[in-house]
Amino acid sequence: MQKFISMASFEWPNRIVPSGWLEHGPFAFWLMEQLKPRLTVELGTQRGYSFACFCQSVKKMKYPGRVICVDTWKGDEHAGIVDKMGDEMHADLQAHVDENYKGIGELKRTFFSEALNHVEDGTVDLLHVDGRHFYDDAKEDHTTWIRKLAPSAVVLFHDTQVRDHGFGVYKYWAEVSAGQPSFEFEHGHGLGVLQYGKLHDGPLADMLSPSLPEVTRKDIRAMYSRLGVGINAHYEHQRYRRRFEERKNPLKKIAKELARPFRK
């Protein structure tokens, strides 16, 4: 079990924002350490939590890696983005990248299909598919980007455990992972990890191997689920603290007014 965890698994995300991906931060840091992708592409970003985790890893390991995220920041049936939220998210994430990850992270505000023209074939070492979550969309996003994958690449699929609201990623994941080197985390809405081509021998290849004992798979899931809960708990604590402060300030103002001497 020790080879499936390292100090990278305990890295703390520098950008913690509302995200269904929060609990996968620990695995993302470990994955980046193992794979050291020279080019990572994320399809679907919103507030950029996972994207920032990838960038943070590259910066810490000090190797020539690039991370590109692609999104229109206009939202869809599953994103919950309305009005000008997309513009605000994009601006906030761009500011974060400018401040912390110049030369590493790049935002492309366009459609996934249009971004294909900006990436060379056979160069993507890590592809993260997290766009619209209908079956056909997940399939299209994956298949249209396959030619961009490097000979030893890994593809991530988020929301593999969600089966309501029209989500169909779980169906597509069941198809592409059947009999293939892969691993699925069940916490954090589910995260599928699919091997493309042949990986170099090592812990990552062992984790994705079909011969990995089921008991070991359960232990790995439990380990990373426990680590992920810590990040989610921190986010919830900060969220409730902000709400408390927002409600407390008006009360403090009223108390101050009541404490003032009465004047006729």
Q: What are the residue ranges of the model-derived segments?
A:
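S-adenosylmethionine/decaboxylated-SAM
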Residues: 2-243, 253-254
